[in-house]
Amino acid sequence: MAATVEGPELEAAAAAGDASEDSDAGSRALPFLGGNRLSLDLYPGGCQQLLHLCVQQPLQLLQVEFLRLSTHEDPQLLEATLAQLPQSLSCLRSLVLKGGQRRDTLGACLRGALTNLPAGLSGLAHLAHLDLSFNSLETLPACVLQMRGLGALLLSHNCLSELPEALGALPALTFLTVTHNRLQTLPPALGALSTLQRLDLSQNLLDTLPPEIGGLGSLLELNLASNRLQSLPASLAGLRSLRLLVLHSNLLASVPADLARLPLLTRLDLRDNQLRDLPPELLDAPFVRLQGNPLGEASPDAPSSPVAALIPEMPRLFLTSDLDSFPVTPQGCSVTLACGVRLQFPAGATATPITIRYRLLLPEPGLVPLGPHDALLSHVLELQPHGVAFQQDVGLWLLFTPPQARRCREVVVRTRNDNSWGDLETYLEEEAPQRLWAHCQVPHFSWFLVVSRPVSNACLVPPEGTLLCSSGHPGVKVIFPPGATEEPRRVSMQVVRMAGRELQALLGEPEAAVSPLLCLSQSGPPSFLQPVTVQLPLPSGITGLSLDRSRLHLLYWAPPAATWDDITAQVVLELTHLYARFQVTHFSWYWLWYTTKNCVGGLARKAWERLRLHRVNLIALQRRRDPEQVLLQCLPRNKVDATLRRLLERYRGPEPSDTVEMFEGEEFFAAFERGIDVDADRPDCVEGRICFVFYSHLKNVKEVYVTTTLDREAQAVRGQVSFYRGAVPVRVPEEAEAARQRKGADALWMATLPIKLPRLRGSEGPRRGAGLSLAPLNLGDAETGFLTQSNLLSVAGRLGLDWPAVALHLGVSYREVQRIRHEFRDDLDEQIRHMLFSWAERQAGQPGAVGLLVQALEQSDRQDVAEEVRAVLELGRRKYQDSIRRMGLAPKDPALPGSSAPQPPEPAQA
């Protein structure tokens, strides 16, 4: 690229950006500028806008330290723009020149046009951060090697086949990422980067590492995943500061034993390699991950040829929100859905091309099978076609909400197979502290969700007998003697803890204590042929030498019974210093209690119910600049203060409700009262009430728009929103539901919070659509849903001052936005309606227009309006499907598992 551009050419390019601007146009271009940040990467014609500013040289431009530009521009215009940066933005500290904002027909991100940088950029003396991701760089620009103050360099998703030796001369570099390139070797000079702390070289073609890499004395994180490494240099043991070493998905056959001696190493990821043997130091280390290796297996007779390892790069698909299907060929592919779910189809998974469809469903009680102590962590993913077996297992990664409590609990992926639900072997992958993936292998497609459950241990009991121990509580054991079963049968156990303070408060007895709650289940006949010995820890604080046996009770519960039975007199309790042992012939739930109370069964019912209740508060807030927009949320008690601090910048409203208790999966409703109604036709609105389902780890939040039939010009409307209980989950103790019924009608009421719609002045009266005459308009189609004229009017009424950002993301030119502002400068509503309807008329009849609108709303940080549009589309789709189903024209579609779907199996009762 040329380093300079002549003055007349620069002025001509700037004038092309807006020939009609007068001398004060620079002040109107500064909405792109926020403080010391200039973000032009999402604006059409960003380079022209920057050139225009460079010509005018406003004072604010000299203060810019952070600049973002899209490289999806004309190469010559991009070259001219970059050449002006050293003179016009001399204080620049961060420069982001990224592609990836545009996608191809399959949804994959497109690379930008950038292939080089002007030599003059080395004059940016203050530059510390340079991002060149998603471009077409084949070599590293020479000017980058002269940026002595550069601290972070991002080169991901380019076409680099090598890195220059001079890269090792950057004295301040602390962060370097070169993922998704074509690197085959690394320069030895890389080891001279003494300040480098994070190095990411994943998704390349590296087969060896230079020994000099051990010279990176400050390195904290090293990611070499998804390369072709067959061995590692011993010098890696010299990385004494290393904390994270990721080597999964390589061809490693051996690993240096000295890696176990790195003093600060907290994670060594060796999954999916060719490791058949490991040094004992690594095999026993708790921070090593080894899944997917053939450990202990014999080596093949003929080693595979290195040529065979040169597998063609697997195609990658990135789906946008308007796509719900994708093709898969026998070649395989890696797919990232718009909702964040990832799938990997290995080569040969399908014998013929197949189209995969997906839906992300909101959780509801009939669709989410939860055990008594399970918690839902994700929405429900449906993958179709159902039941089609793949020739190789497909990898599935689901994002989920990190559980609050992890002690004695585990995260699993639950799926439906042959009319029953089961849990898959699940591995967790941590991308960031609050961004976790649940990874599993699936042989066919169905419904999938992520749940947190008590740690489950299982084994196959042979006729010779065996021992089953709990990994969550080592003191819990089950001993199967020889002859307990004739045929091998599978048994499993779960252990649930209860806090001693909660029990003591419930009973009003400071000395009360309980053991962990034990659930035992099995397959096969309900009874064993020989008594099975169960060992439980004594209640906390109690020892076998000091306890009063008259206060020790063994309780037993067999679903679907509603009561806990005291079976202390029916078994022989053998006590040691720390444990109690007893024998049973069938499995169920067992619990040890230590209390002075006599009727322990009823207390156990209350305690078990308390174990499953969540203490929550309900909030109702109105948006400060649009009081008709109401946020409703149900929050765990410990999250209320932090959430309110975050929301009260944009919302205001009454104090949260008093604390109420709810079960996982319990339905509740929000009803607007005293003159206020919901202002939308929503699928979650039943008889004017907004439906919720409480899941403790999900957000439980909805934003709705309200209206009133009262005259707001006469006075403000003082209404309210009340919250009422709905259906309780099936697996709630019957006595809990009965207790609520005995409380009368008020048992369904939980809280009431005030809502106020302020009085409108005469000029602010409702004018939405008043006097507006537009041709009938339907945007979309019957199968994906329509947006009618009234729907678009509703959207227009929500946008307010955010409409220019939405317009730019819709592809409306900046000049057109300015023209609309000027033409309707005294009427904000008319500005919004004119922009939205003129865009809609141009899009009428074109596919993908509705998806483009939703995407623009999300990119403009108006998720609330985007969700309302989705709700309207979903309602339209339902009505359309119902109509064609009534006419007998609907194709057969696998039905959702309804409320009659079997729940996870409970222990059998003898």
Curated annotation (Swiss-Prot):
Protein name: p53-induced death domain-containing protein 1
Domain ZU5: 322-454, 455-596
InterPro entries on file: DEATH-like_dom_sf (IPR011029), Death_dom (IPR000488), Leu-rich_rpt (IPR001611), Leu-rich_rpt_typical-subtyp (IPR003591), LRR_dom_sf (IPR032675), LRR_domain-containing (IPR050216), Peptidase_S68_pidd (IPR019502), ZU5_dom (IPR000906)
GO cellular component, one term: endopeptidase complex
Record-listed N-acetylalanine modification sites: 2
Record annotation: effect of changing residue 815 to W: In MRT75; loss of interaction with CRADD; loss of activation of CASP2 protein
Associated disorder: Intellectual developmental disorder, autosomal recessive 75, with neuropsychiatric features and variant lissencephaly: An autosomal recessive disorder characterized by global developmental delay apparent from infancy or early childhood, impaired intellectual development, and behavioral and psychiatric abnormalities. Some patients present seizures and facial dysmorphism. Brain imaging often shows cortical anomalies.
PTM-bearing positions, type Phosphoserine: 299, 305
Induction: Up-regulated in response to DNA damage.
